[in-house]
């Protein structure tokens, strides 16, 4: 070991499987550690320590917890400094660099320019070891010598190399030679960094008692970000002002690994060391640097604007690089195409490129744009979005954005730091407040953008081997990469913060089979992270997930308990569109209800709304189930492990492989490549290759496409197969085609019947007659036709519809139905439907008018709670009292606008549970009905179709008519008989004595020519057999008139 060093130390590069243990160099171990069994690790600049056990030269127990807590990763270079008493100070120097302080206090550049080969000695480097001669390039020696000589000549200059640890801890430690030579004391609490011109920033300067060094904190990360510097880049600093507040002039240069290319002329007053270092950077280039190079500038306060400055010979440049902060703030992180829009409205399609270093740039097309618009010197572009396509629009020199930027520049000049020292403290405070406001604004915009572009209640988890544990976040979503080695799973802070998960307790994991598992929700005080307890591993195994699999969890709430529900693979977040979905895609994915209730729009943009009622949650679950059914997800239940459903996708055809369900393959021990037979319904066998990829996924290979063509399977179709065994050879026997997505088949049936079925099932009204086939018996299930299921689903939805559910379809978004509950009366608020408020842009508190049927207006407040739920406040109870609306009553209102003022107009009271009203009538007839009350004569009733009947997709029948004919207690099926003798199925439901004609009414009216406002007669046909379905015979006014004459 080097005797001149204060503390002995060694270095180690983290390699795969570093979590399990760490090997101490042999000479270091024999001199300091040998014979000891316990040591203590302490991260630099932290008071917390970890106790680890020593097993010979290995650090074992406790090491894993240490690296996980401090987020060590593969490739990081870690320094271990032994301070005595079996205590190590550990420093993470970031990837591919190591730091050795020289006894003369030389610049860090000498140490970081040497790239060390860590492949030998398990990645360990001791102080006493010499670097291999072949690794010391000539350029490195020259650079290090230049730095050494320059730094010794002028102690007012130093170079700061940016490491990943610096950015993580938001600190920069100043070299000892610099702080000691320039007389820094603990009275120095602030430091000013300036480029010698307009830009400057005030940062905190602190002293580290443990190491005896000064460091910059609280703002270093933002300073690097604003100057486009990442890990590996470096700054050249020169001391230009002393006193209580130090002033450093800086010059950002390119990174050592070539990530950035920011050029500027050196200031005349910079020291010789800066000049020599800049010369070193110039010598490193393989191509001589031209006199001019393009660069883009960016202002944090105007994140949509980017300004390009071009050199005279810009024609030689192939790509035009975009500013790193600009692309990061605006979420432009994927290659593709981008449009350049000039001042005449013309669009220029330009390629958007992404290099291996993560730099985004404009490719082919930007030069033509520059030439056509005479922009040879430079120009400013504004980012706008057309759906998911970015567009850069050319800004004129007189644009508001330019004037705003000039004002900002002037404001910065006014706050220049090179003024009267007496005003320095005042300026520092102003700058601090300004910086803090900028940070708050940036955080607000980032939070808002991420909420809009991503599904904040979703988190995607990828299971990797133990060596690849990391947590990463992107602009589009929350992504966690975890290892099954760990007992708990840390959740991303963005995910927990956005969803308000900040307290330890219990959380429920909901599997794909509907099985719930309780696990602990833990809180780590050290880093403020929330994590799932050890029960998450059982959840992963029970749902057939293994190393290499990715799965998405959706956060839902059951009362106050968070629930993470497992989403199927095809319902994962759409990342390619930035986490969102276009309206076109939404419309395509919306489920269509039967014609009786037209099209009901569901919120597929899935935003977590904790204010939804329980019936909304049930509705969402039913829609999810319907979506899974139509998409053809795996239907293999755990009790039917021998059955698997396969779906032909474009990826299957392109890669010539048909993936088997992981659960199916695991439960049937199909885990090795080989051969498998496919048996079709005609008894023909097809020998198919069975493949296994690197992730362990099993799939059908060569031969399956011929099998599919022989059985007339097309793209998008699904079919079910049963696994049987012939000796030791597996065989998949075809059962039937379950789903077909071709448009030609959609009109008939989603499922095609098996070839052996003699005829399709007979479907008439509410009766279906299927034929039981051998395949049905073998599969232990019977598939009902989709037409028949549609009728059942329509009746179920109509029943839920009449139980108090919101009745406003997407085509009638201006209608909303309220139900008065005891909670509404107690809290003096009437909640607006979340869908109604969203579709009508009612999202801000204020006032609204309630318009009754007499034309009177009632001014009512509109409230918005913490969860974003909109409701009617003060004034609605007076309105309800006037209209004699009581608890349990429901009424419908229509939203209209008077200029910019919203007005809710009362249509009618729909249902009432008040016992006092049962004897009379449950609903109030609207004034728009032609007659004041329906005409009831014996078994005839005359009605008029109103707008409310069309809106509700049903007709309310008077209770007097039902009682007079003794059918007020006959609920269920009913038949409507048209004038042409055609029978139409209907359904009668009861709500506290009210009988409604629901299913089939709209189609019946259209077929019989009943129009809005037209009077018609329904006749009850007296059936002698009370067990049969009641019949209502329809007669139009014209028919009645002819019969009378």
From Swiss-Prot:
CDD domains: B3_DNA. PANTHER family: B3 DOMAIN-CONTAINING PROTEIN REM-LIKE 1-RELATED, B3 DOMAIN-CONTAINING PROTEIN REM-LIKE 3-RELATED. Residues 121-147, 423-449, 606-625 are annotated as: Disordered. It comes from Arabidopsis thaliana (Mouse-ear cress). Transmembrane segments: none annotated. Keywords: DNA-binding, Nucleus, Repeat, Transcription, Transcription regulation. This is B3 domain-containing protein REM13. Gene3D superfamilies: DNA-binding pseudobarrel domain. The keyword DNA damage does not apply. PROSITE patterns: B3 (PS50863). GO terms for cellular component: nucleus. InterPro entries: B3_DNA-bd, DNA-bd_pseudobarrel_sf, REM_fam.
